[in-house]
Amino acid sequence: DPARGAYLRWMFFAAGPLEAAMVNEALGLRSDDERAPSILGYGTVEQVIDTLEGALDGVEYIVGDRFSAADVYLGSHVIWHLAQGTLPERPTFRAYADRLMARPAAIKAAQIDDELLKAHPFPGMEEMGS
């Protein structure tokens, strides 16, 4: 499959640079040290975010025009980090997240999650407004 390279690239991008950059961002571990790009292993947070935005700009899915497991994995990162505020709210990221969440399987999964949470609430859920 000619898309295999892109598929593998984005699976590993999500697991490596994206996750590391977002966790460091969440923990406030940003460095102004000029050596940061080589020490951190992914460049800068801005480079990671810009790389992802460039890849998603103008495409429906990360491997082009068809949905793949790479979208499930990368999309879960995008959706989670948008919700947490660690990934900046940019139109490209929001459009991608919205496309993924509008898929029939995502809608069904969310309904199942909601039903399970109602049947098995966890302590403190009421205080969270859920």
Task: Show the residue positions of the predicted features.
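A short, structured active-site edge motif that brings together acidic residues
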Residues: 1-3
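GST-like fold's C-terminal all-alpha helical module
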Residues: 10-102
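Short coil/turn segments at secondary-structure boundaries
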Residues: 23-25, 110-113
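Short, flexible coil/linker elements and helix-boundary hinge sites characteristic
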Residues: 28, 41, 111, 120-121
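Acidic/histidine-enriched, glycine/proline-rich intrinsically disordered or flexible terminal extensions
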Residues: 113-130
